[in-house]
Structure formats: C-alpha cells, structure tokens
Amino acid sequence: MKLIPFLSEEEIQKLQEAEANSSKEQKKTAEQIEAIYTSGQNILVSASAGSGKTFVMVERILDQLARGVEISQLFISTFTVKAATELKERLEKKISKKIQETDDVDLKQHLGRQLADLPNAAIGTMDSFTQKFLGKHGYLLDIAPNFRILQNQSEQLLLENEVFHEVFEAHYQGKQKESFSHLLKNFAGRGKDERGLRQQVYKIYDFLQSTSNPQKWLSESFLKGFEKADFTSEKEKLTEQIKQALWDLESFFRYHLDNDAKEFAKAAYLENVQLILDEIGSLNQEFDSQAYQAVLARVVAISKEKNGRALTNASRKADLKPLADAYNEERKTQFTKLGQLSDQIAILDYQERYHGDTWKLAKTFQSFMSDFVEAYRQRKRQENAFEFADISHYTIEILENFPQVRESYQERFHEVMVDEYQDINHIQERMLELLSNGHNRFMVGDIKQSIYRFRQADPQIFNEKFQRYAQNPQEGKLILLKENFRSSSEVLSATNDVFERLMDQEVGEINYDNMHQLVFANTKLTPNPDNKAEFLLYDKDDTGEEEESQTETKLTGEMRLVIKEILKLHQEKGVAFKEIALLTSSRNRNDQILLALSEYGIPVKTDGEQNNYLQSLEVQVMLDTLRVIHNPLQDYALVALMKSPMFGFDEDELARLSLQKAEDKAHENLYEKLVNAQKKASSQKGLIHTALAEKLKQFMDILASWRLYAKPHSLYDLIWKIYNDRFYYDYVGALPNGPARQANLYALALRADQFEKSNFKGLSRFIRMIDQVLEAQHDLASVAVAPPKDAVELMTIHKSKGLEFPYVFILNMDQDFNKQDSMSEVILSRQNGLGVKYIAKMETGAVEDHYPKTIKLSIPSLTYRQNEEELQLASYSEQMRLLYVAMTRAEKKLYLVGKGSREKLESKEYPAAKNGKLNSNTRLQARNFQDWLWAISKVFTKDKLNFSYRFIGEDQLTREAIGELETKSPLQDSSQADNRQSDTIKEALEMLKEVEVYNTLHRAAIELPSVQTPSQIKKFYEPVMDMEGVEIAGQGQSVGKKISFDLPDFSTKEKVTGAEIGSATHELMQRIDLSQQLTLASLTETLKQVQTSQAVRDKINLDKILAFFDTALGQEIFANTDHLYREQPFSMLKRDQKSQEDFVVRGILDGYLLYENKIVLFDYKTDRYDEPSQLVDRYRGQLALYEEALSRAYSIENIEKYLILLGKDEVQVVKV
C-alpha cells in the first residue's frame, strides 16, 4: 500500500473546527485531535486522570496504520502486561471494524496483514521487549538465548547472599582489611555482625540497577557529594535560616502581645516573651553568623527554664483554654524549629571535623560495591539467569556498542510510543533514546500520577520535558488533555479544590494551575448535590478509644463509620457492593478492615497481594516438618511437629518425654531424649506409659521413613508423601477456610519444585532459602482463591491506579506517612551520590570509673543532610500524587475517612495562605493526608470548598444506629401454586438444546485451533499417496507401527537426537557473521556460541556448512547481506475450508533475500534422506505457506524457493 501523507497543522485545525461544529453527543476535544494527528516531531501528552489517553493512543495507532505504516514499525511500551493485552484487544476490534467499513482493496489487504501481525507487534512492557531483544542479539555479548529471569525473590536472595559472602571474605582478608573493618563496624549496630552492611549493600544495589550504567554511576557519581562539599556555603545558608526563624518568632510573639495576650495580662510567661523579643531586637542585618548563633542559644536557653515551661500559657479558665492551647501549639512548633537549628550548628561543626574520615569510609564502600556489582553480574552470567534490570543493561550495551543493530531498530521504528511516561526510570529513558531517531517519540503520561518512586521511577524525567517543551516548542510539542470523562463534577471540583491549594513547584514538584486542573467533560453525568465529596472524621475522645492495643478486639470507629455509609448506599440507594471501593495507602490496617466487614456480613474482595504466605499456620507446620527431617536436633521445630494435628502430642506427653535425659549427660536435645525413651535408657522411664510408648514408636518410625525417603527423592515428592502419609492435606481442607489452606499447601509443593528447577537442589538449601527470606523480614505472596462476584473492593491506592469505581472511600487518612527511608544509615541521590552516617569514637575525658571513657557518635555527612532534604521534598510530593490518584478513582462520590479529637482539631490554628496555597511549613509538617485536608478546611473556610467535613461520634455508631445487612432469602414463598421452578428448568433445557444444535452445525469451527503452525496444517498440502505404516513427521505414531522388542541401551554415552542437531544447526546458521570471510576456524568459534551440548556440536559437519557458501545460492547470500533476513517470525490469517472460519498461522522463516521485485526463500533441513525428491515432497506444502506469507507481506509474486539439504555427507541445494 502506498503511504498516505500525514495531516498538516492547517488540516488538523480544520478537523478540530469540524468536530466542534458537529452534532455528536460526545465530541473529541481539540487537544485529543491534536494528539491523534500531529506528526514529525517529539510529542509529550500530559493527560490528566480520565482524559481518554488510551482512546487517543488507539486512534493515533489506527490513523498511522490507515496511512500505510506497518504495525511492526511501531514500538509501543506499556506499564503493565495487562495494559498491553487491553491495548491489543482494542486495536484488534478497531482494525477489524475498519476492514469491514472500507471499500479500498489495498487498505483492506494492508489492514488484514496488520491484524495478522498484531500478536507479534512490539506492544508490551519494556521488560518484554528487552527479553526478546537479548534473545535475538545476546550472542554479541556471549549471552545464550535460553537465559531465564530471576523472578523468584527467594532465589535472588540466595544468590545475592552467596556472592555477598564471597566478596565479604575477599575484602575482610584483603590488603585494605583495616579500612573494611571500619566500614563493617560503622553499620554493625547492636548486631555486631555483617547484617547491617549487607542490608545497605542490597539497598545501594537496587538503586544502581535503575541507572543506565551501574559501574559508571559508581565511579563518577557515588562520591560526588564529598568532592563538592562546601562548608562555608553551608554555614551561610544556616545563618540565613536562623535569621528567618528568629524573625518568624518575633512576628508571632508581637502578634500575640497585640491580640490574644491581652486576655492574660498578668500571666508570668509574658515576661519571658518580652525577654526574647529584646534579645532578637538587639540584632541587625549587619551582624555576623556568630552573633545570630549567640542570640539563638540565649533564646533556646530561656525556653528551657522552669523545666521547659517558661513560655507556656498555663491558663485553666475554660473560656480561655482554646486561646491558650492555640498559642502553646504554635509556640511549640516555633521552638522545635529553633531547637533543630541549634542542633544543626553543632552537627555542621562535627561534619566538617570528620569530613576526611567519612570520605575515606565512603571510598572503601565504593570499592566494595564495585566488586560486589561485578561479582554478582558474573555469577548471574554463569547461571544464565538475570534480573529484568540486567536484561535492560545488556540491551543498552548492545544498542550503544553495535551501531548496525541500533541503526536497524531506528530505521525500523516509524514511532516510539510510551504510555505512563511519568513512571519511567533512567534506564528505560536511555533505551527509548537509543531506539528513537531523535524526533519520533510519542510520550503519554501525567506527572500528578507518578507514584512509583520506590521502584526508582523518576517523575523529573517527565517534568523536565514538560518545562522544556512548554518554553521551547521547537524542541517538542506539548499537548494538554485536561478534560475528564470519568468523574462527576462533584468529584472533580473537590479534587481541584484540594490540589490547587496544596501542590506547587516548591512542595509537589509541579504548580497545580490551569495547565493541570481537571475539567468536567462527561455530559451524561448531571450535577447531584447528594454526591458532594465528604471528609468524614471519627470523633476520637481523649480517653483513647482507638488505642492500638484495643484494635484487635474492638471494631475501629472509622470502620463502623464506613460500614454505616456502605449499608446506606446498598440498602437505601440500591448500590451493588462491587460499585464500592475502599482504598488504603498501605495494607497495615487491613486486618481491622476485614474484621469489621466480616462482622457485618459485607462481602469483600482484596487485591490479592498480601505477602503473608509463610505466616499461615498450615505452611508453618510443614516448614517445621521439613526442618526436622533435615535436622531432628532442632527442639522448637520438633515440638511444633509433635504438637501438630499430624501427631497430636499434648503438653503432658511432651513433658514426660522431655524428662528422659540420660544420666551420664549434662545436656541433651529433645530428639536424643526421644531415643532414650525408646531404649528405656533414662531414670525417668517409668513416666512413659504403654500408650505413649506406642505413640512415640509410630512417630519415630514415620520420621525415620521420611528422612530416608528425602535422600533420593525430590522435595516435591517428599512434601506430597508427608501430605498423604498423615492425611494432612485432607485435614486442613476440613478446617474453616479449607480451600485457601489447601491452596497454600499445594503452592508449597509447587514452590519447592520451582526451587529445584532453578539450579538449586536439596532440602538443606530450600530451608536455608526460607529462613533467609524470613530473616530479611520478607514473605512470599499468598495464594489467590476465587473471590465473590458482588463484593466491596479493598485495595491499595497503587493497585487502584488506572481503575475507576462509582463510590470510593479513602481510608486511614490519619495514618502517618512512611518515613523509614529518611531514617536509614544511607541516603542516595542521583545528583549528590552517597550520604552516610559516620560512627565516630570520641574520648569523654571522664576520670571516674563509673563514667565511660569513650562514646560513639553518629554524624550524618554533609551529603546525607542534603540528600535527606531532597528525599523529604520528593516524599511529600509523592504522597500528594498518591492522594490525587486516590481521589480521581471515583466516578460519582468520594468519601475521605479519618479520625481525631474534634476539640483539638477545631482549636488548631495555621499560618495564613500565601498565593492561594497552604503555607509551605504547614504542608511539610503534615504527618498524613488528614493533616493536609484539615488545614485546607480551616485556612480556606471562606472559599466555599466543594467538599464538606463532619465529625461522627460514638452515639451515631451504635449497633442500632449502623443497622444490619438485609439478606434476601433465595427461596420464594413456599406456596406451590406460585412455584415456577419447573418452568425455569424447562426454559433452561430448551436453551441447552439450542446450544447443542448450534454446536453440531459449527463443530468444525469449534474444533479448529485459532492459531496453528505450518507443520500442523501441512496435511492440507500433502499429496494423496499410499503410505500405510509410514509415520508422517509430527503426526504421531501410526496405528500399524510395529513395537520394538530390542534390548534397551544402558550405555552412559550421551544420546543425540536429530531434533537437537537440527536446532543447533539452525542457531549456527543464524549466528554466522557474514560481514567477514568464512573459514573453518571462524565457524568453529561461532559453533562454541551455540547453546547445546558438546555431543551435539561434535555431530555438526562444519566442512559441509563451509561448502554450502561455495554453492551459487551460498555465494548470492554472501554477496547480498544487506538484503538478507534470517530467523524472521511471521503471522498470517487463513481460512479453514471445512468450517469457513479464520485462523492464524505462525512460524519462523530460516531466511530470505528481499529484492525490489523478487524474493529468494531458503530453508535448512537436516533430515536424513535417500533422494532429494523425498524431502521436496515432504516440505512442499510448508514452503508454499512461507511463499504465501512473503507474497502477502511484500506484495511480490516472484518468489524462488530453495531447500538446503544437510542430511547427507555432501550439501545439496534444491530448487522447489
């Protein structure tokens, strides 16, 4: 098909005007049209929530296909496999519809080919692309194409630990062992072992994996913060902060004296307030840093007088208490900040004093990390097993170092498209740069929805382009999709009201202005005052009803509040449970939520990713059983097994057995005591009665049989033997939640089987792997069971991204943000590198014996403090984006649920807004979502916000006030006169009969596979001939085949099959470098790269391969490598003559030469034969299929077909 030109700006403008003037019920927006049809430059589409970005992507792809672009010329990256599948499904429907609608024969044929090629199109995650890429080009780096992915976290942890200990030993015994010992002690903590260091090493490694070149970043950026440390500049910054903090305090005190303080005229604290004002008043702008530090010290000292109550307003008058509380709260905030600044003066002094020592420690750390990264890389190459990040690194390495590969992809891809661009990381960005020609990128995303920083996603990649394209349109086009087609005006107004007051460049990384605000566009949704967003607060009184210690036994106030609203929606408004979603920022409180919903009989469906598999009781029992089989001298595991339902020893029996110690031994394990009891070799043998002796004998016999069975058998077989011997699998199935328990046990056997298939063998290593997972405070994913159909959805905000629900409750608004990262011993930054806490040993100068002579002081390096500030801003920005994602999931109504003391919250005062935003300190001091929402509610009271708040107390949450779930009986009235059950059965039988008739009529279509390979449909092309007793290749054993009674060959010599030789020969022919002269030596080197056994390699005749390239066809291939295509996959749509149904044929062409008006197709065959005509007849149909596929793909009729026969001593090339 001839390419149709893309639209010009003027044509796009006319299309926009025509759409605006059309009578369509739901029109495309001008920006959507621009995003669909603009071409010829890099395009960044900033698509707000619900703005139809998937629609835009599909329409853009469809437009390009309709203009003659091939689906294989598009690189389309999605964030998840699910998103890729959905995109392909949409495209399939759209292309099929377009084929039916068009009368253009060329377009019909072109789109038909695209539909057939759709399964093989480059549409998927970056990981799926890099896997295919490395499978194809990995040989350039000596990577075998049969590599596997280390997806199992436990296996990955085992490998990491083994490599860590190897590198650890090398450094511990090496030349720099003194420096390394210092590094080890720096992270040892109370454990006094290597675990602290190991934890930081793995953390840094995960960070490095997101960079495009880990070793390069280590060498160039790891120490950057130490190299550019400027203490003079830091001192000046600190002085400015002290100045500002003192002026803020002065303003607060003066305002207080002029206003509220008049109510407390004779209060003692006011004298101290005046003292501080005098101290601050003595300063002027010209004073140096020493003067400001001195005043700060005196001010802080005054605040600490009278046990820290020198400035406290202690008024107890009821009517003045709110004023006093508000003053004390603000004063406390002010002095907390001043105290921190005072501490920073001392810290900065220590940082400067120990800068050299910390730098030396960091260099040692750099050396260790470099060795660990390289050793782990080599180990994974030995295993031929890689993480996804490794695959990406190798892909980048090939694209950077092999220009011919890079250029082939840049020429192939007409456009490089990426969805969810805001969640991209630096390694992925580098790959996209290499695949693009520099002006053909189409990037879709929304920085407000970037919530994967913990996976090393960097929203600044998106933000940098956003700012650059906005300021310099010649660098790229920025298109804004702001219209929201998902949510009601009530949801959007509430969302805008929150974020236009919360998010700016300073805190939030973007300014939530007209460019980012959501615009209501769903004309089908009419405004409804009942759907106004609600901020619901459980009124927690000062008695602490919600103390964590009570939550396990008492339903939380917030959940009773939520249940009341759910029942109201369900029973009063007829809302189905599946229309309601409960969103949480983490799963920490899920147990409380599930307990509450269960209590009221509300069905619930979770997101299925609770990682508590190893905590389930039935799995713990099995793990202890395996531990005992491996080593019965483990008392805890042995007791657990004996007490388990498999054997049922009670406390009395265990107590009797535990007293069976041999008299001549000081200490014995429980197992040794069991042996003594059996042998009656203890002075307490009288405690063992007959029934217990019998029970003990049975236990010991079974345990011995298991231990004996474990040696020659697989873990999988051992586990199932345990299940069957003691009926444990059946037992747990009869317990409450039995199917889920059985699924857990079944999964244990499967996981053990997977473990042994991943090059790890044996019970010992399996147990060690499990213990390491538990030691690292990890767990394995729980096993999913079928959820109820109509159920409330409970999921994390992260899981909800991309989904939508009519009614959304955002729970746990009061749950504090996770700040573990900022408390770590190490904080990393792309800009500054390593920030680390240095442990310094200091002399105390103490003379008395009871005082320590030295103390250890933890000193955060200057870079650590800088990285900490950077991390804090990035974390707060991400939390804002997380809240944005949660709020924009709602279609009709949004509920935000938290808790707090009404009295305390309403007495809270906040600094005035600045430029329509919350004060930056207010935003940065917030501990949770609720703090932000409440501050907005208070500061902007006069703005008539589009969400309301209300407190709900205990009196409104009694059992009677909440109500009960009304359950409708499945049985109707018992009156037989109205019983229509027989009619229903009759109707069902009629339907089944119709289905059977339909199935009979269309049986051929039903039995036809939707996808077939050339060998599967070869029967359509085989000539009819008398071949009784002869097995056709691939068709299975013929009925008349004779059974062989020859003695089996028990020799240890490795057997080589024809299939193995054929597969290895094909790979060899693919790998041969045709850019240089072929010799026997070069072929021998290439053969070494082929992934097969040496026995198979020995069977490949290289002289024969070399002889092929002396033939006319071989010479033609050698002379036209720029026209050569090898190992090319294809898909083709065909019609089954019997059923008249379409199916897809897929296969791989060994190779062909593509000329302007001719194609030369060739196929290698290693089958043994007597006459060439045998193979020609056998493969004529297969080559005919290949010919048809090439003809349809390139619209070329002149196709020459050759079989290259390698099954005899001499090579033969036969034209078919």
Swiss-Prot record:
Gene3D superfamilies cross-referenced by the UniProt entry: 3.90.320.10, P-loop containing nucleotide triphosphate hydrolases (3.40.50.300), PCRA, domain 4 (1.10.486.10)
A Gene Ontology BP annotation from the UniProt entry: double-strand break repair via homologous recombination
GO molecular function ontology, one term from the record: double-stranded DNA binding
Keyword vocabulary terms for this entry: ATP-binding, DNA damage, DNA repair, DNA-binding, Exonuclease, Helicase, Hydrolase, Isomerase, Nuclease, Nucleotide-binding
Obligatory cofactor(s): Mg(2+)
CDD domains in the cross-refs: DEXQc_UvrD
Catalytic activity: Couples ATP hydrolysis with the unwinding of duplex DNA by translocating in the 3'-5' direction; ATP + H2O = ADP + phosphate + H(+)
Domain UvrD-like helicase ATP-binding, first and last residues per copy: 26-488
GO CC terms of this entry: cytosol; DNA helicase complex
InterPro entries in the cross-refs: AddA (IPR014152), DNA_helicase_UvrD-like_C (IPR014017), DNA_helicase_UvrD/REP (IPR000212), P-loop_NTPase (IPR027417), PDDEXK-like_dom_sf (IPR011604), PDDEXK_AddAB-type (IPR038726), Restrct_endonuc-II-like (IPR011335), UvrD-like_ATP-bd (IPR014016)
Residues the record lists as binding ATP: A47, S48, A49, G50, S51, G52, K53, T54
PROSITE patterns per the UniProt record, alphabetical: UVRD_HELICASE_ATP_BIND (PS51198), UVRD_HELICASE_CTER (PS51217)
Secreted as UniProt keyword: no
Domain UvrD-like helicase C-terminal: 515-802
Tagged with keyword Iron-sulfur: no
EC number from the UniProt entry: 3.1.-.-, 5.6.2.4
Its biological purpose: The heterodimer acts as both an ATP-dependent DNA helicase and an ATP-dependent, dual-direction single-stranded exonuclease. Recognizes the chi site generating a DNA molecule suitable for the initiation of homologous recombination. The AddA nuclease domain is required for chi fragment generation; this subunit has the helicase and 3' -> 5' nuclease activities.
Family affiliation: Belongs to the helicase family. AddA subfamily.
NCBIfam families assigned to the protein according to its UniProt record, in alphabetical order: addA_Gpos (TIGR02785)
Assembly description: Heterodimer of AddA and AddB/RexB.
UniProt name for this protein: ATP-dependent helicase/nuclease subunit A
Annotated source species: Streptococcus pneumoniae serotype 19F (strain G54)
Lineage, broadest ranks: Bacteria, Bacillati, Bacillota, Bacilli, Lactobacillales
This protein's encoding gene: addA
